[in-house]
UniProtKB/Swiss-Prot annotation:
It comes from Pseudoalteromonas translucida (strain TAC 125). Belongs to the UPF0102 family. SUPFAM superfamilies: Restriction endonuclease-like. This is UPF0102 protein PSHAa2523. Pfam families: UPF0102 (PF02021).
Length: 123
């Protein structure tokens, strides 16, 4: 086992690490961090950012290599549906109406060196 794999006790820690890397990247691109790991009955919202007045919900996926398309192709139809329901829950819980929003996807591939692919307004 490599030293890199020993950094995490479980997959949740690994996911949180890559969500933080995605958040840092998006901040470097001019977005403002709002919240991470918002949990609700429908699932989790990985990263919530603001781009100007637009609320940006960011789904983060990591894959260590490009097998089966890598992280770029890891967002399933089922995950998209859960993500939408979670966003509706967040908006209702925070009493946000008439809020411009978009859904972005950050695909991170590679371990230990990372390649970040940021896709805006994915669905």
């Amino acid at each position: 086992m490599s030293w890199f794999k020993q950094l995490w006790q479980n997959s949740r820690e690994k996911g949180q690490y890559y969500e933080l890397q995605a958040q840092k990247y998006l901040v470097s691109q001019g977005l403002t961090a709002i919240e991470r790991n918002y949990y609700c009955p429908f699932g989790e919202l990985d990263v919530i950012m603001k781009d100007g007045n637009t609320l940006v919900f960011v789904e983060v996926k990591f894959r260590k290599n490009h097998a089966r398309g890598g992280a770029n192709y890891a967002l399933s139809i089922q995950k998209q549906a859960r993500l939408k329901r979670s966003i509706y829950h967040y908006l209702a819980a925070k009493n946000l109406t008439n809020q411009p929003l978009r859904i972005d996807y950050v695909a991170i591939t590679g371990e230990p060196s990372m390649h970040i692919n940021w896709l805006k307004n994915v669905f």
